């Protein structure tokens, strides 16, 4: 008799995706972040569901409902901090996952890569709307500033902003719709993750060498299930340490003050995981130019497959590209730091140089490095 996992229609799908899936024998720990992102999504949806049971999306009660969750609900403080810091964990894993994709040339699986970019946009939208919900000072002013950027769109900008706000300012209608979207988007993300995996399993995983691994495959279970489990244990240990000992480290103290439209905080800034894009936005003095640069800072990921000039897929044996890659990582860290600083010298010029360097490395230097390496390696 056939084993049930190979014959049952539902189990068969799970079997092909997580048990009998042929995987390259040499994929490193950098390939763990896919499963860790799945874990992050489960943590966020679960904790978010329990928060939604006690949260009220009304401007008069939103702030106090979050306080009520922390003070009166059983382990409400824990659920709230898991959810708030879970977003940071999500983006750490997300950025490492993207970085691995760039380093090892995984972007040449174009369909998987493009779905990944859509997933990144959806996750960023979800995180932004979630940050507005506690209705603290930074929530309110962050929502006002970021939604206002759409007014830079010629002709339809102002109408578009008022349509999103549901009025002439960020108010009750805005909060209610943001809550609705923040609730539904994670489920759309989960559906898109399925599509992401579908495309990935069409081609199979890439590997650190960037060469075809058809001749050397091993089953996903038990090898990579146990490896993923180790990653999960390490991640959860670090995460819970952070949640229980430093829950407010990444948050903004301003968000412990209720939203007040008559009092602007001295420095309006988004959460840390958006600071690099915020720095790029601020480095251009023109409003529309800044918005375009902001969108392009993420959309530029889509050109990686088009600008791959090297004859080798992975950067493993390409020292010039490696140097540029780590320069890009350092540049993103500088942009993240600048995004959290006030708009004054010397931060303005540092941000502008870092923004130019970001696009320069991706669009010009990496493709040139690929061509040079082809010559050097006589590939």
Curated annotation (Swiss-Prot):
One of its GO terms (molecular function) is metal ion binding. The keyword Metal-binding applies. Heme b b562 binds at residues 83, 182. It comes from the Eukaryota. It comes from Chaetodipus formosus. Keywords: Electron transport, Heme, Iron, Membrane, Metal-binding, Mitochondrion, Mitochondrion inner membrane, Respiratory chain, Transmembrane, Transmembrane helix, Transport, Ubiquinone. Component of the ubiquinol-cytochrome c reductase complex (complex III or cytochrome b-c1 complex) that is part of the mitochondrial respiratory chain. The b-c1 complex mediates electron transfer from ubiquinol to cytochrome c. Contributes to the generation of a proton gradient across the mitochondrial membrane that is then used for ATP synthesis. Belongs to the cytochrome b family. Its cofactor is heme b. GO terms for biological process: mitochondrial electron transport, ubiquinol to cytochrome c. The chain crosses the membrane at residues 33-53, 77-98, 113-133, 178-198, 226-246, 288-308, 320-340, 347-367. The keyword Acyltransferase does not apply. Heme b b566 binds at residues 97, 196. It is found in: Mitochondrion inner membrane. It holds the Pfam family Cytochrome_B. Heme 1 (or BL or b562) is low-potential and absorbs at about 562 nm, and heme 2 (or BH or b566) is high-potential and absorbs at about 566 nm. A ubiquinone binds at residue 201. This is Cytochrome b. InterPro entries: Cyt_b/b6_C, Cyt_b/b6_C_sf, Cyt_b/b6_N, Cytb/b6-like_sf, Cytochrome_b, Cytochrome_b_C_euk/bac, Cytochrome_b_N_euk/bac, Di-haem_cyt_TM. GO terms for cellular component: mitochondrial inner membrane; respiratory chain complex III. It is a multi-pass membrane protein. CDD domains: cytochrome_b_C, Cytochrome_b_N. The cytochrome bc1 complex contains 11 subunits: 3 respiratory subunits (MT-CYB, CYC1 and UQCRFS1), 2 core proteins (UQCRC1 and UQCRC2) and 6 low-molecular weight proteins (UQCRH/QCR6, UQCRB/QCR7, UQCRQ/QCR8, UQCR10/QCR9, UQCR11/QCR10 and a cleavage product of UQCRFS1). This cytochrome bc1 complex then forms a dimer. Its main location: mitochondrion. Binds 2 heme b groups non-covalently.
């Amino acid at each position: 008799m056939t084993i049930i996992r190979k014959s049952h229609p539902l189990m068969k799908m799970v079997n092909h995706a997580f048990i009998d899936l042929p995987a390259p024998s040499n994929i490193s720990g950098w390939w763990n972040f896919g499963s860790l992102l799945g874990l992050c999504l489960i943590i966020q949806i679960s904790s978010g569901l329990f928060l939604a049971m006690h949260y009220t999306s009304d401007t008069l009660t939103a702030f106090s409902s979050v306080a009520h969750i922390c003070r009166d609900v059983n382990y409400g403080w824990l659920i709230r901090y898991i959810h708030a810091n879970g977003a940071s964990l999500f983006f750490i894993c997300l950025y490492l996952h993207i970085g691995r994709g760039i380093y090892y040339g995984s972007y040449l699986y174009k369909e998987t890569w493009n779905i990944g970019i859509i997933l990144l946009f959806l996750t960023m939208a979800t995180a932004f709307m979630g940050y507005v919900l506690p209705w603290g000072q930074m929530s309110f002013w962050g929502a006002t500033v970021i939604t206002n950027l759409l007014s830079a769109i010629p002709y339809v900008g102002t109408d578009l902003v008022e349509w999103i706000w549901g009025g002439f300012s960020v108010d009750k209608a805005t909060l209610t719709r943001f809550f609705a979207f923040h609730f539904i988007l994670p489920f759309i993300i989960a559906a898109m993750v399925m599509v992401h995996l579908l495309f990935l399993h069409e081609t199979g995983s890439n590997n650190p060498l960037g060469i075809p691994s058809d001749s050397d495959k091993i089953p996903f279970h038990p090898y990579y299930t146990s490896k993923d489990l180790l990653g999960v244990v390490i991640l959860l240990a670090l995460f819970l340490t952070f949640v229980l000992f430093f829950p407010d480290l990444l948050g903004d103290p301003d968000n412990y003050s209720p939203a007040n439209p008559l009092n602007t905080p001295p420095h309006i800034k988004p959460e840390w995981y958006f600071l690099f894009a915020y720095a790029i936005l601020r480095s251009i003095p023109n409003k529309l130019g800044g918005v375009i640069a902001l969108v392009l800072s993420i959309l530029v990921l889509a050109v990686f497959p088009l600008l791959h000039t090297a004859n080798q897929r992975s950067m493993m044996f390409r020292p010039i590209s490696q140097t540029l890659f780590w320069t890009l990582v350092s540049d993103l860290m500088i942009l993240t730091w600048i995004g959290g600083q006030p708009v004054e010298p010397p931060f303005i010029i540092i941000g502008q140089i870092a923004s130019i360097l970001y696009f320069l490395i991706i669009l010009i230097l990496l493709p040139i490095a690929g061509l040079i390496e082809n010559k050097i390696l006589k590939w």
